[in-house]
Amino acid sequence: MLRSIVFSKANSGVLIMLFQTDIAGTVVWFVLFFALIFLYPRIMLSQLIYKIEQSAVRIETMSQDAMKITARKVDKNVSKELKNKIEQFSDFFVIEPSNIDPYGLVKKIDHTIRGMESRFDEFVEEVAGDKSYSEKQEINYGIRATIGLRQISKIVRHYVEMAKKFKNLQIAMILQMQLPIIEKIAESEIKGAEAFVNGWPIGDSIGPLVAASYMEKSKEIAEDIMASTTVIEGRKCFVLKAKGPSPHLGRDDEAIAAIMKKNKIARIITIDAAQKLEGEKSGSVAEGVGFAMGGWGQREMIENFLIAKKMPIDSIVVKVGMTDAIIPMTKDVYDSVPVVQDFIKRAVRRTKKSNKIIIIGVGNSSGIGNDKKEIEKVKEVVDMLDKKKKEEEAKQKKGGWF
């Protein structure tokens, strides 16, 4: 009897201890649970801010590197004054004309673009007045790529600071999700700056490259536009491209008007680079209708001019990746030239043999000369860059963990 009483008391003590432990554990668990509800977003925000801060620093470093690349083209011994001038000019901006009254908007845009072009020319003349015309153009477009990268770095930094200042998790998350694409674009801008200052062809140069493949002797017929005549499939063709091999875009609208003033044109064929969809092969070719030209202003003026004449317009595009248009031309894009030429032949055959046609290689002429003899030089540069790219990829693969 006594033993059973002692045993029951011992069991009761154990049960009380267990019960007390369960209560303490439950209280601790609830405290931790509610603490984490408040602390987890803070921890997550801190991690996100750390990551986006690193990305912002990387992009800012790229921006500084792009400035150095351009400055070295001006002078190998970069002075502090030159560096400051380029850095100040990299904040250059263009205000879009008012569109409240759409009448005359295209002319407003054209006027603004011409003003921008003049301002770039003036700045290059100021910092590199002793350079040749071709070198000035390379510096000019190198600065444009530098400005693009500078703006990207400033926008990223703006949102990083916004997330920090207001401790805003949503801003940090949205930015962090977009950063892989933004960094890819930033990388393409610095590669573009390098391509421009070295006079290399870029992805957007495929149109002028195709046009140059038809040119024997060319002459300038409008602002920065070279023209040549050739016969394709028995039809007389006027071939146009921006002046090269230094970077130019040219005034295609003026060139078209000059030719059509003296000749009866039956068809216009445009060749340009176009952004591919993910999954499509870079360098693939497609055809359609309409004037293939990016940007705004000049295309609208051309379309207004041609629509009044009910002119058939064919478009042939070479598909390039999201960032391929500004980076040095890849081998896939270069190898599309014969395919584009086949598309041109088919388009030309849709007109009578007595008809005259205008063929326009739309795009930046960086690295592309003004006749077919220059094509071999382009091939050498593309092969050199392709070899360099493969070596870098092999080095990265060798240095990886797997």
Locate predicted features.
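Intrinsic disorder/low-structure terminal segments
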Residues: 1, 6, 88-92, 401
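Conserved mixed alpha/beta catalytic, RNA-binding, or beta-rich assembly cores of soluble enzyme
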Residues: 155-329, 334-339, 345-346, 353, ...
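Arginine residue identity/basic-tract feature
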Residues: 3, 42, 58, 72, ...
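N-terminal signal-anchor transmembrane alpha helix of single-pass membrane proteins
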Residues: 1, 6-16, 20-45
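Membrane-interfacial segments
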Residues: 44-47, 218
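PRPP/pyrophosphate-binding module of the type I phosphoribosyltransferase fold
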Residues: 360
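Electropositive, gly/pro-rich neighborhoods at or near active sites that engage anionic ligands
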Residues: 50-209, 213-217
